[in-house]
Amino acid sequence: MEREKFGSRLGFILISAGCAIGIGNVWRFPYVAGNNGGGIFVLLYMLFLLMFGIPVLSMELAMGRASKSSIIRAYHELERPGQKWHIHGYLGMIGNYILLFFYTTVSGWMLGYFIKYVTGDITKNTDSSQMFADVIANPWIMFVWMAVIVLIAVIVCSMGLQNGVEKITKYMMLILLGLIIILAIHSLTLDGAGKGMKYFLVPDMNKIEEVGFGNIIIEAMRQAFFTLSVGMGSMMIFGSYIGKERALVGEGIQITLLDTFVAIMSGVIIFPACMSYNIPTDSGPSLIFVTLPKVFEHMSGGRFWGAMFFLFMTFAALSTVIAVLENII
């Protein structure tokens, strides 16, 4: 039986970018950039993407294309007799499972918050800190939303590569990109936009001296590897679905550009909004589920913008869940 292939180059790029684009682009990259010298961090990050990220990504795609398999079988297919490279395949698959456990849970939170904004459960008088604490304290609510995400991902993957994974992820990613552009434009119209963009992108020499240039280099390198989801072999499965007529380095560059665009736009959304309402930025879950709801409380049409933001986040997380699940199965 002939192995399925992507129906279009756009489908391949969008689903591969969907695997790379995730919550780390939103709740980690802007905060780390702002706290590590702003523009200097962004420049170093892009340099390391060029030096290490794109070559490693291209290598994973090449291994997938050469073996026509996902990570475990790929190493068995490509290694020479007596070699032990397949051990990394098993370690990589364990990493994919851990990533899936994490993402299905957090994706459920995103979906739950989107529905809360749509139904009006979140208002200007809502205590965002207490609301998030209540969500964490209720395992049944978390289980229900996680189960919904898992069910959606399983249904999409069961529909096959072209009719399921490629088709649905392509629409999700196009909507995601549209949403992030709309949200970024809105943030740039706020009063604190200039101050926020300066904090995010202009090199801060005082911050560089405070943090240390060596530490900034390490953080930029860490983010470059983290953002592309390389190292666990999650990109191999997508390489296995493309033909030899594709230039893998070129495809890797396209994927990296999309991932970087979302990371930069996330900073454009977050910093102007936080600076406009004098709300300190944070990282991790507290940024998404505590800090930003406070921003939306102060914002005109906050319920609408909150719903749009959490729809964007749900698509970003769900695209990764679908991609990782496709790699596992």
Pin down the residues of each PLM region.
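Membrane-interface "cap" regions at the ends of multi-pass membrane proteins
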Residues: 1-27, 56-61, 65-90, 243-247
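Membrane-embedded translocation segments of transport machinery
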Residues: 2-6, 166, 170-318, 322
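Inter-helical loop and helix-membrane interface segments of multi-pass membrane transporters/permeases
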Residues: 3-4, 32-36, 66-91, 104-162, ...
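Extracellular loop-to-transmembrane helix junctions
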Residues: 4, 33-59, 141-142, 262
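Transmembrane helix-boundary motif of multi-pass solute transporters/channels
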Residues: 10-48, 233-239, 250-253, 257-260, ...
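Alpha-helical transmembrane segments and their helix-start/interface "positive-inside/aromatic belt" motifs
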Residues: 11, 38-46, 83-101, 166-176, ...
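Central hydrophobic cores of alpha-helical transmembrane segments in multi-pass inner-membrane proteins
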Residues: 24, 44, 49-61, 71-73, ...
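Hydrophobic core segments of alpha-helical transmembrane domains in multi-pass membrane transport
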Residues: 45-54, 93-118, 145-159, 174-187, ...
